[in-house]
Swiss-Prot record:
Protein name as catalogued: ADAMTS-like protein 2
UniProt modification remark: Glycosylated. Can be O-fucosylated by POFUT2 on a serine or a threonine residue found within the consensus sequence C1-X(2)-(S/T)-C2-G of the TSP type-1 repeat domains where C1 and C2 are the first and second cysteine residue of the repeat, respectively. Fucosylated repeats can then be further glycosylated by the addition of a beta-1,3-glucose residue by the glucosyltransferase, B3GALTL. Fucosylation mediates the efficient secretion of ADAMTS family members.
PROSITE patterns, sorted: PLAC (PS50900), TSP1 (PS50092)
Domain PLAC: 918-956
Keyword Cell wall biogenesis/degradation (UniProt): no
Lineage of the organism: Eukaryota, Metazoa, Chordata, Craniata, Vertebrata
Gene coding for it: Adamtsl2
MF GO annotations: microfibril binding
Organism: Mus musculus (Mouse)
Amino acid sequence: MDGRRQHPHWAWSLLAVAVVAGGAAPTEASDNSPTSNSLEGGADTTAYWWGEWTKWTACSRSCGGGVTSQERHCLQQRRKSVPGTGNRTCVGTSKRYQLCRVQECPPDGRSFREEQCVSFNSRVYDGRAYQWKPLYPDDYVHISSKPCDLHCSTVDGQRQLTVPARDGTSCKLTDLRGVCVSGKCEPIGCDGVLFSTHTLDKCGVCQGDGSSCTHVTGNYRKGNNHLGYSLVTHIPAGARDIQIVERKKSADVLALADEAGFYFFNGNYKVDSPKNFNIAGTVVKYRRPMDVYETGIEYIVAQGPTNQGLNVMVWNQNGKSPSITFEYTLLQSPHMHHLPPVYYSFSEAASQSTESTERQELDSARLLGFMQHNGSLYRQTSSERLGLNSQLFQPPAPEVELGPSRGQESNEVCKQASGGVCEGPPRGKGFQDHNATGRAFSADKDDREISAHFTSHELLSANTISDQLLGTGSESEEFSLNETMNSIFAQGAPRSSPAESLYVDYEENEGPAAYLINGSYLELSSDRINTSSEAPFPNTSASPPNLAGNRTHKARTRPKARKQGVSPADMYRWKLSSHEPCSATCTTGVMSTYAMCVRYDGVEVDDSYCDALTRPEPVHEFCAGRECQPRWETSSWSECSRTCGEGHQFRIVRCWKMLSPGFDSSVYSDLCEATEAVRPEERKTCRNPACGPQWEMSEWSECTAKCGERSVVTRDIRCSEDEKLCDPSTKPVGEKNCTGPPCDRQWTVSDWGPCSGSCGQGRTIRHVYCKTSDGRVVPESQCQTETKPLAIHPCGDKNCPAHWLAQDWERCNTTCGRGVKKRLVLCMELANGKPQIRSGPECGLARKPPEESTCFERPCFKWYTSPWSECTKTCGVGVRMRDVKCYQGTDIVRGCDPLVKPVGRQACDLQPCPTEPPDDSCQDQPGTNCALAIKVNLCGHWYYSKACCRSCRPPHS
């Protein structure tokens, strides 16, 4: 059974269709090449014609998509040719193929490649039978790169064989999946037909034109960002062509988590190595530079489609502003192209004359239900309540607050149908993401304070909100909600008073506040905002109505200005706006002009008043700003080099320059120095409490014991000051026993390579590995050196006289400083095609190459650590620390390998602290994902410390 197939499910669900090439053009599946045999008239010639097709052969597989074939033969007959008439061979193919048994294999069965390798178990090689298993491209570097070569290995990894794979074996082409036919990887189109070249478009539609999906792009920028993890964006299930790119090189780290808060990589404040991950039903490729000096950018890409929602996170390590762009493609919902602008008006009847009825509570837990992806709303039968669905996103998002930002922030999302242009903030549609800031406005012509209570139940189309739910009348209060931190946007449209414009003022009783509503963070600020669709969205936040009574806002409605005698067609028109600022302050940018809808008197109104079909296209022009000046950029300061006494902190200082829009790169320091910019300091002194003389220890040496044997490892012990000042009774031990590795290590060899020359000069080489019983490659020191197979043999086309043959050098016998390396030098000859070892005199001892040579590794820098300090707590979980220093001789230096630096700080878990009676008033609020809040370390935030009071309590309290 082929349990390892990589074929999409849709392809196997299609019926197999036989493909036969007709006409004069032979197909790739043909296994014979027709020849032309045309004779002039009068001579005897041979006539050719096709015989009948044979029956279809048995399917090459029992499931998973095999191959069956038919053959026909070209028949011939000698006859007299007719003058002037050409006689040709059979034209076409003699063999044709089709797919068969396309149903999926049981998931717990063997793969088809495994079945083929297992079939060799009964065969004898070199006098013994082996157990064989397949090697796949992901876990072995093939001897052959042909996709239809079957690679098998013995279970112990000591032997490999390569044979042609059977027909029906899965293979992979560049942009199509395929199947092996007669040793060649033939394509299977997205229509499930063999030899078809039909491909999926970017929307995942077979032979589609790319118009059935929406391309979502956005960018994440935050000023004064808090340390720790923050949500960049939520990627819904079904997303394709995912790209998340960190545009500005920084110490930030991208991470990926599911909707429950489980991290796939770079989570829990640990950085994983860049590699490919199998996540959400697709391969996610994560790459990043290994250090700040390495070129390249950090990015996450995946082809998709995903089978679950994903949260893209960023781990901010220095509080600087990140710059991240993201994009992905989603299949369009049926309503996406036809979502009308939505206005929500509150009838005057809903507001009574008394103060108690004018003020209504805003149900913040349902506010985010205001916008739905299909533009519909929910209502309740009560005439005083407008129902809104509390589930803005599908699937539900994790309820995690990512920290308020008091500085500048802009996290924009733009959605477009394929082939369209994404320009500026979206208008008149809903655009979704998780890191959203909500805006809510309420207007009353008498400047009365007013708010609304939102609940959700019955589905109601947005087109009928005004008339069926909110009543009629020319004078009404209008409500608009814009979610703009990720540009989630619902733009109002007129119902019965199109000439009115709404402006909102805020009265501040205190500074900006924040609320968490269904997992989305809403920040409140006092910026003045109007409801025009051209209002700027980035860097702007607004507030929902007051929840605690400490904030009020007023609104005023402009009087209607309807011109008598002006026809509806002339009432509104499109007008090109003035040029927007250049998109770049330096280098070449783009300056855009957009159309805006204006009234007859020149007042800008909502775009929905004008005819969308006559809207002018945006105009884009290049604009040249000044050249970007180089600048110094610094990393964050390292920890102090010492936990006591005087030490040093270091940071990296590099010269950076914006070379082109969006391309920021490190450059030579000379450029920054030429501008006379002051270079920041790379080192500064740090002082901790004085420390007396203390013992310092290096790391343990490597155990040199052979398998199953015992030996001793050692470490250096030194006093931080004069040796006499340290207490001898507290001196740590300098050696301890160790045990060698298990005795399952064995030498494994590859096949011999080609011969490099003739007799006396030819060499053939193979690779020799030390492997465990499960096939893992380990250092050669774990295998017996005495039994290591030779990696170099003499070779040639005739017998060779004895000559010296040197093997490869072994590793240097020291990890630092000066040492010795050795190699094996043998006297060998080639006799009857086989290499033979001879005695040294036959080769001439005077000509023997050296077997030893000096070697020099990096300077002997070595890490030393002091003993652990006392735990910072007497009960519960605390922290203990130690000094970590890098020495070269007696000098403290910076040359040690940071990858093997010992930890200088670790948690210490002592006995539980005395418990107190539980506080029943401290409970978690329903609907708050407290498990996720704890996982991303948000208990210190003011909201979660209350909303997750019970979960965030210290342990044992």
